[in-house]
Each structure stands twice: as structure tokens, then as C-alpha cells.
Amino acid sequence: MTATGVGIVGAGNISDEYLRSLATYPDVRVVAIADLDVERAAAQADRYGVEAAPTVADLLARDDIEIVVNLTIPAAHADVALAAIAAGKHVWGEKPLTLDLASARAVLDAAQEAGVVVANAPDTILGEGIQNAQRLLLDGAVGEPRTLLTLMQGPGPDAWHPRPQFLFARGAGPLFDIGPYYVSTMIQLLGPIVQVEAMGQRPRAERVVGSGPDAGLRFPVEVDTHLSVLTRFASGVVGTSVYSFDSPRRRQAFEITGSEGVLEVPVSGFDGPTRVLAGDDRDHAWSEVAPPGAHRERGVGVLELARALRDGRPPRASGPLAFHALEVMLAVEESARSGVPVAIDSTAPPVEPLPPDWDPSAATTPSSSAATGSRATSPAQSGGLR
């Protein structure tokens, strides 16, 4: 079989994770990488045995690339996605989809018109941990979901990231850097969100680069680094969330309370067991349910997109899901600024869990209609947008 050709735009830190994992999936093949920093792209290409494209335009012009993986900074997401779409490529984007709803809608509309598909990170929702939790919910492990509690606290990435400035700029901070993992998981497990209310603060006007050649450099903080959020779902479920880069203590939690118990979801990565509490915790009735599927890593969303294209179906980590998550996060930002609740206009289509035996390391046989790269159907782009 012929693996789907992939081109990567952006050779920053996150590209290592994609290049490592995509090399282990036989259904896809990284052909080339490009970056505005030509030397950085060349170094990554040499390290992982792929080609370095001289420019992004050169990468987009290649006939052996069907999917473009957009790993640029958030401010460049829309421009790179639109250029890839104009070149007839499908797009897998890092989170967030874009920085605003107008550009996000422009990306999805352009893809719809061009007959290509946009899918978007985070692909942790395709990891065996969250997939296992979704199957348990659908099987009624905790009864009817009623409330949600999520928590993400830590000191922030400025201590370890060699170039953390963009993580404290518009389109980042804890809400847009870490929030997509939580918000996308909320939507995956509990359905569309209809309203949010938030409060935020920015305790420090400046941060300091903690590692690398720029260690000691001060830089401005452009976004709130602590947010407390209330969320209402279309189903009636109500959630409480904290997103913070201002705590020396590192804590992560994602708990769904149902009519018959509590589900602890491993939201921070691709694996880990789901914990289920049946009844009252005084009975010490917690049990761990290990995921049945094969291990998955960063880049599994690119693989699932490639298989979806060959099957002629929408990808699970779809553009409409990313659009809905983006609107939710922008609404959180607006509510924190205005002090009033904000309604969410978009929705998201239901996402079916992957089959328990779905294996990223397996070589699958493409359908006969996909030999040259099939186009997924239009609902992959339009579903969920109002």
C-alpha cells in the first residue's frame, strides 16, 4: 500500500514529537519539513531522515504531500492553513485552530470550497485514556452525567521552555495553550457547550526565560495567567474549571460526577487508566479500568485524518469541533474581561469513539477510491457551524 504523504510546516520544539511518532505509523510518511528558519528545518530534517524544503511554498507545491501539518505559532495558524488549502492540501493544525472566529470560519469555508479537510489538535482525545473514558460513559458506568470538575495548575512553561514568549502572548496563556486539551475533552465526552462565565487575573506583568540561550531575559505577559470558569452544557451538565500558570503546585484533574458515581479521566496525555467510583468514596469503591486499545502518541490525529480521507468520512478531531472549542475559549476570555456570562453560538457534531481494537501501528488497506487521496464529505467542514 502507499502511505499518505505528510509535510510539516514549523520546526519548533513540538515538531520532535510529531516526527518521532509519525515515523512509527505505517499508514503515513513524512516527506518534508519547512520553517522560516531554514537552518532549524534542515537540522530537523537531518535528525529524522526527511527532506528539508527550501520554503513553505516549495513544500506546498509538492505532489507527494497530501496532508500539511501546521506546527507554526498560533498567530500564523490561519495564514499557513489558508495557503495549504489553496494548494489543494488537507490540513492538520496544532491548537488553537486560529486566534479568532472570523479567521477560523474563513479556514473552514475555504476548505469546504476547495474540497479538502481541516482537522485539528489536540489529538489526546483520540488517546486510549480518553477513548476508554468515553466508552465507559456511554456504557453508563456512572449513570447520567451531572457535573464536571477540571483543574490545571502549575508554574507555567517559562521555567523550562527556551523560547516561552509566545506562550504568554495573545492566543496562548493557560487558556489557549492548555485549555484546548480540557475543552476538547469536555465536548468529546459531554457534548456541546452553551454558556460560560469566567474571572481572570494576571498577577505578574513580566516573566523571565528560565533556560536556553535567552535565560534571564524578561518579557511581557499579554494574557491572563489564572482563570476560573463556569461552564453550562446543552445536556444540562454544569462544570467548574481552573486554568493557571501561577501555582508552584502542579495539579491536573478531570472528574465527571454522574447519578451513580464519579469518573476520573486521564486528560493530560494519551494513556493512563480511567478511575471509577461507584457509590460513596467512604466505601473505598474506586476501581481502575485500563484502556483496551493500542498505545498512541502525538500525531495520532494526523493518522486518523489520513484513514478518514481514505474511508471517505469526516475525521474525529474535526474542524467543527476545533471551531466550537475556539469559540468557547474566546467566550471565556470575553467573560473574564466583561464580568458577564457569554452564550456560545456554535455547536459540535457528536464524536463516536474509536473501535477498541483501533491500532495506529497497523498497516491498513486503502479503499479503491482513495488511491490518489480521497476527499472527505462536506459535513467534515460544515457540521456544527451556525
Residue map of PLM features:
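Conserved SAM-binding strand-loop segment of SAM-dependent methyltransferases
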Residues: G49-V56
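Predominantly a Rossmann-like dinucleotide-binding segment in NAD(P)-dependent oxidoreductases
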Residues: T124-P220, G339
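Glycine- and charged-residue-rich phosphate/anionic-cofactor binding loop of Rossmann-like
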Residues: V28-V31, W286-A290, R307-H324
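Beta-strand-loop-alpha-helix segment that lines the small-molecule cofactor/substrate pocket
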Residues: E66-I67, I73-P74, A78-I125, G140
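Active-site loop of classical SDR/Rossmann-like NAD(P)-dependent oxidoreductases
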Residues: L36, P292-V302
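Contiguous beta-strand/loop segments that form the cofactor/metal-binding neighborhood of enzyme cores
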Residues: S184-D271, V300-G312, M329-V332, T347-R386
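N-terminal Rossmann-like dinucleotide-binding module
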Residues: M1-Y48, S367, Q381-R386
